[in-house]
Amino acid sequence: HALMHGPTFMGNALACRVALASISLFEEEHTMEKIHRIEEITRLEMAGFTDPRIREIRIMGACVCIEVYDPAVLKGYAAFARQRGVFSRPFLSYLYAMVPYVISEAELVQVLDTMKAWFRQR
């Protein structure tokens, strides 16, 4: 079955053009700078936040993940977050957010505060 996926990975002209346009948008809209700023704010907001139920907090770019020891700790989080204007849900033992690159600082803080409030109120 050699080259079975050849058409998928060959230089499809439309796909190449779309990829180049996407790269141009990243450069023109300073997207990488926005992602770095999101990460910086997230690190500042999450600094020092601990809870004995949390195994680890990971942050990379526009993603934050709180891993807990027991997934039952996260039961009910989606409804809790919705009441605070945040659409989010846990997955297994992970409470995470992958925010859009156009998020405002106030909106980002709202997402992070909601995550922290879940642990503080329980």
Spans of model-derived segments:
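Conserved N-terminal phosphate-binding loop of PLP-dependent enzymes in the Aspartate aminotransferase
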Residues: 1-122
